[in-house]
Design a protein with these regions (language model features):
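N-terminal structured subdomain of primase-like DNA metabolism proteins
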Residues: 1-98
């Protein structure tokens, strides 16, 4: 199992996203207003807990996993998101040696 998969397995996307987005359940999924663009009329941001992904069907038309969510929300690159999410998940990152 890769480090990325281990982190994804330890962090529930609902826990992460619900820290900054108010979500309501709609069947198996959750819906709310996208945190990445102004919109207060039509909730177009959907979290799919079964696949650990999210998608905005509105203005930004983007989606991804927990890494992409944190990268977009914080303006970070993958390396920064990896370190923060690894710490949150309790996963120790070991440097790759050539």
């Amino acid at each position: 199992m890769s480090v990325v998969d281990e982190i994804k397995g330890r962090i529930e996307i609902m826990d992460l996203v619900s820290e900054s987005v108010q979500l309501r359940r709609t069947g198996k999924n959750y819906i709310g207003f996208c945190p990445f663009h102004p919109n207060s009329r039509t909730p177009a941001f959907v979290v799919f807990p079964d696949s650990g992904t999210w998608r905005c069907f509105g203005q930004c038309n983007e989606g991804g996993d927990i890494f992409r969510f944190v990268m977009k929300k914080e303006g970070w690159d993958f390396s920064q998101a990896l370190h923060v999410l690894a710490e949150r998940a309790g996963v120790v990152l070991t440097p790759v040696t050539p």
